[in-house]
A protein has these predicted regions:
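Active-site cofactor/substrate anionic-group-binding motifs, chiefly glycine-
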Residues: 58-112
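Secondary-shell segments that build the walls of catalytic and ion/ligand-binding clefts
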Residues: 198, 208-271
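Phosphate/diphosphate-binding glycine-rich loops and adjacent basic-rich segments that engage nucleotide
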Residues: 158-230
Length: 368
């Protein structure tokens, strides 16, 4: 992922909360909803970890998404998860309408186990739900020494090129490649829409007007009564409207992810569109991949070439007013270092939502 200084920007009305405190409270909320302890801790780790890295669109702001759907029963706290591997390097995991974060964890573990013995492993997940920010899973593989790949489809939010209906998801793609020890890792995490839904919601919550090119021009973007982006405000594919600025390329990437995560695993497209509103199972699918770096060349040689590439890019000419060229993942790593020391910044509107859930569930609220 690369977000420049955005990962360091903090809303003025934010409260700083220590990571361990936030994780404990969030995990407690999910345990009350009958999510097993280990799974609740994993969910809390990912959601708080997103805020830790400055990815506010996928952090504590997503807690109500899960709790609401667990409460309605469209996401199951204790699903029947099944896995089968038709070949030594491919597998299919049936998530049983459970929490996507839990299913993705199992799938990436299976992919890495395949890669350890056969050089690579890919697992498709079906009948799942939101799996957090895609980079979390690619990074998990990277931390174990593999090239990590993760992607997911999602409910209809993005209009195809020349269309106005929000029929495709934001369908993120993440790739993480381990660099030299103590050097720079490569960590790309991107939506195939111009931005993720959560980024538009974050901007609107903070009183900012989303930049042109984020949302279609038919309806001005606005939040509904639950603080969620209205479905009559479809996002644009990466590249924007039409073909002049490459919108058809973002549309193509989104459709590619849809096919790899949906058709490949057998999760129905129509069911996913229906599930976007939260009244039925989300019906999402994911793809997890792990590849051994030394399956091509000695790992140290690959990493040395990576570092040389990064050096040439950093040393290239910069645009006026810019003092640095980032490598994907650097801004988030720097944000994490700051937030571990100072606490994660949580805007008041998110704290208010969490307070309401804490009261309803009978758990401690976030401290002030």
């Amino acid at each position: 992922m690369i977000a420049g200084v955005e990962s360091h920007q903090v809303p003025a009305d934010s409260t700083r909360i220590q990571v361990d405190v936030a994780q404990r409270i969030v995990a407690g909320m999910f345990r009350v909803m009958e999510v097993p302890d280990e799974d609740a801790a994993l969910v809390a780790e990912l959601l708080v970890g997103a805020d830790l890295r400055g990815i506010r669109s996928h952090g504590l702001a997503r807690v109500p998404y899960f709790l609401t759907r667990l409460q309605r029963g469209v996401i199951k706290a204790r699903p029947d998860i099944r896995f089968r591997a038709p070949t030594p390097t491919t597998g299919l995991l049936e998530a049983g309408d459970g929490i996507g974060i839990v299913a993705a964890s199992r799938a990436m573990d299976e992919a890495m186990a395949m890669a350890a013995g056969h050089g690579c492993g890919f697992v498709v997940v079906k009948d799942s739900s939101h799996f957090g920010y895609a980079g979390f899973w690619a990074e998990r593989a990277m931390r174990s020494g593999y090239i990590g790949i993760s992607m997911s489809n999602s409910g209809g939010r993005v209009a195809p090129t020349f269309g106005t209906a929000p029929i495709l998801g934001t369908n993120p793609i993440a790739v993480a490649i381990p660099g030299t020890p103590g050097g720079t890792d490569f960590h790309l995490d991107m939506a195939t829409s111009t931005v993720a839904v959560g980024k538009v919601e974050t901007a609107l919550r903070e009183g900012r007007t989303p930049p042109r090119g984020w949302v279609g021009s038919t309806h001005p973007p606005h939040l509904d009564d639950n603080g969620v982006l209205s479905f009559d405000s479809p996002l644009l594919p990466l590249g924007g409207e039409g073909t002049e600025t490459g919108g058809h390329k973002g549309y193509g990437l989104a459709l590619m992810v849809e096919l790899l995560c949906g058709a490949l695993g057998g999760t129905g497209f129509e069911a996913r569109i229906a599930g976007a509103a939260g009244e039925s199972a989300p019906a999402m699918g994911h793809l997890m991949g792990a590849i051994r770096v030394d399956g091509f060349r000695p790992q140290d040689e690959v990493q040395s070439d990576m570092e040389a590439t990064f050096g040439l890019i950093r040393g290239s000419a910069r645009a006026p007013g810019q003092d640095r060229i980032y490598i994907h993942g650097e801004p988030e790593a720097e944000a994490e270092a700051i937030h571990r020391q100072e606490g994660i910044p949580v805007p008041s509107v998110i704290l208010e939502q969490l307070d309401r859930w804490a009261t309803a569930l009978g758990v401690e609220p976030m401290p002030r």
